Structure formats: C-alpha cells, structure tokens
Swiss-Prot record:
Recorded superkingdom: Eukaryota
InterPro entries named among the record's database cross-references: Sec13/Seh1_fam, WD40/YVTN_repeat-like_dom_sf, WD40_repeat_dom_sf, WD40_rpt
Source species: Caenorhabditis elegans
GO biological process annotation, one example: mitotic chromosome centromere condensation
GO CC terms: COPII vesicle coat; endoplasmic reticulum membrane; lysosomal membrane; nuclear pore; nuclear pore outer ring
Residue span of region Disordered: 294-313
WD repeats: 11-50, 56-97, 102-143, 150-195, 202-245, 252-291
Entry membrane topology: Peripheral membrane protein
Subcellular location(s) of the protein: Cytoplasmic vesicle, COPII-coated vesicle membrane; Endoplasmic reticulum membrane; Nucleus, Nuclear pore complex; Lysosome membrane
Similarity section: Belongs to the WD repeat SEC13 family.
UniProt name for this protein: Protein SEC13 homolog
Chief place where the protein resides: membrane
SMART domains: WD40 (SM00320)
Length: 313
C-alpha cells in the first residue's frame, strides 16, 4: 500500500509545475506559475525547512533538474520566458551562475545528464528544438548547441539515457513531442553532431513525457512515455546497438497523462494524469509492470483477480 510520508507547505502563490528531490533525497526543489524556484531541506524525521527562494524568471517555471553532486550544488530551471537558468550554491547561498536564452518559444523541460557524460544538460522547447549546454573545463565556460526541428509543434520533454563506465559508449537522450512521436538521439563523435537514431510510435495524440529508465538490466534499456490520449507505453530493447525497440501498451487511462518518472533504482514508475491521481507501477520478477494498489481494498481486488490470497506475493 502506498502512503503519504509527509506534506510540505511550499507557500507558492500559484500552481506548482514540478518538484524534484536531489540524489540523496535531502533537498527538494519546486517551481511554479508564480515565477519562483524554491529549495527546501528535507530531513529523515519527516521535517522540512525552506532554504532559498530563487528569483530570475519572468514567466511560469515549468521544470527543475539537479546536477550530480560531484559538480556541487547546481540546479537548472526552465521557463515560459524561453530561458534556462543554472543556479549555484556557494557557502549556503544560492545565486544565478548562468542564463541561456536561445530558444524562440517557451522552454518546456530541462534535464542534467548523468555524471558519466560530464557536466551537461538538455532543454526542450515549444519552438521544436532541443538545446544542449556543456561545461568546458579548459575555458570555464558553458558551450551551447542545438538539435533543430526535433518535433513539429514543439518538444515537451527530454531525458538522458543512463551513463556508462565504458568511455566508448554513445551519449543518448529521448524526447517527446506534439508530433505524437518519441525520438531517440545519439551523439556522433566523428561529426560532433546529434543524430536521430530512432523514432518510436505508440501514441495518437501529443506525447507529454518520455522517461528513460536510469538503470540497465543485462544491457536491456527501457523507456516509458505518456500522452494526451491516455496511453502509457513501454519501449524496450535487449541491445541498444543491434536490436530493435519493442513497444507495449501498459494502459489506456480514462484521462490525459502528463508525467512519467522512474525511481533511481529503476524498479518503480510513477505516472500522473488529469484525474489528479498518481499511480505507482513496479516491475515483478517476470519483467512485467503492474500497478501498486493504493489501499487495502484495491489490493484485495487485485489479488482476487489473479486468483491468489491477499497475503501472498
């Protein structure tokens, strides 16, 4: 049974669009239509304390992303004002470290890459482009580039493939857009360009988010996407270099689905939709994704449906 561990009064003055914990679960970043980014300390005893209120955007802030802690306290935010802002914590104080305003429409998403890729982040925009920012240690500057015309009518989300200890492994990311497609992009070291590697079909309406599982299992990669038609689609490949991606429809919800996100260990998936409900999915030993019941009554119903006593797993 899933339970609410704690509630945090963020005191945002308008709708909250995103909330992200850092890798340790000790800090929470939130953002909203009030144009603010807020940071809270989250303690193991369930208590939370406000740490900072970051002011810098001139429009609603849609998304926040934490960098790996090896790079210090870095947080990125994406806003309707077309900007990506990177915030840096130094001696307990947060300040704007870098601002990038190269998109021509709302910046819908931002995501730091796994630390194996180096200090990098990707941004998605309603202008149809994906932005890439990479920190160059030799010049101590952020180097920017774009993957242009990725999705017609706009890009809604970007998510990086898990990092690899193999230095020869390709950098990859997945994007979701209003063209009803999920696309995988790979970086070509020879040409120094991002190449469209695969287009994945499974939606009949805008794809709101695509999440790449942060953990591989014996070389198996997993992506989950959700869309406005209510489809929750699982894509898998047993070998990303040689095998095709296979699609499986996990569910068609009775409402639009907006968000999908894996747990850090990759064994749980959360999905949020227009019905104000968050559903949790988990992968069983057979590699199948099943819903986690929200309460005991639902658990009993699921157990009866599969013909097993409620006490068994």
């Amino acid at each position: 049974m899933t339970t609410v561990r704690q509630r945090i009064d963020t005191q945002h003055r308008d709708a909250i669009h995103d909330a992200q914990l850092n890798i340790y679960g000790s800090r929470l970043a939130t953002c909203g239509s009030d144009r603010l980014v807020k940071i809270f300390e989250v303690r193991p005893n369930g208590q939370s304390y406000p740490m900072a209120e970051l002011v810098g955007h001139s429009g609603p802030v849609w998304k926040v992303s934490w960098a790996h802690p090896k790079y210090g306290g870095l947080l990125a935010s994406a806003s309707y004002d077309k900007k990506v802002i990177i915030w840096n914590e130094q001696q307990g104080r947060w300040q704007k470290a870098y601002e990038w305003a190269a998109h021509e429409a709302s910046t819908t998403c931002v995501a730091f890459a796994p630390h194996q890729y180096g200090l990098m982040l990707a941004s998605a925009s309603a202008d149809g482009d994906i932005g890439i920012l990479r920190y160059d240690n030799s010049s101590n500057e952020w180097i920017s580039s774009k993957i242009q015309k990725c999705h017609e009518q706009g890009v809604n989300s970007v998510c990086w493939a898990p990092g690899s200890a193999d230095p020869a492994a390709k950098k990859r990311l997945v994007s979701a857009g209003n063209d009803k497609n999920v696309k995988i992009w790979a970086f070509d070291d020879a040409t120094n360009e991002w190449i469209l590697e695969k287009t994945l079909a499974g939606h009949t309406d805008f794809v709101r988010e695509a999440a790449w599982c942060p953990v591989t299992n014996n070389g198996q990669h997993t992506i989950v996407s959700c869309g406005m038609e209510g489809n929750l689609v699982l894509f898998r490949t047993s070998n990303i270099e040689t095998e095709e991606w296979k699609a499986k429809l996990l569910e068609t919800a009775p409402c639009a689905l907006y968000h999908s996100s894996f747990s850090p260990c990759g064994s749980f998936l959360s999905v949020a939709g227009d019905d104000n409900v968050i559903t949790i999915w988990r992968e069983n030993l057979q590699g199948q994704w099943i819903k986690v019941p929200r309460d005991n009554k639902e658990r009993e119903g699921m157990s009866q449906a599969v013909g097993a006593p409620g006490a068994q797993r």
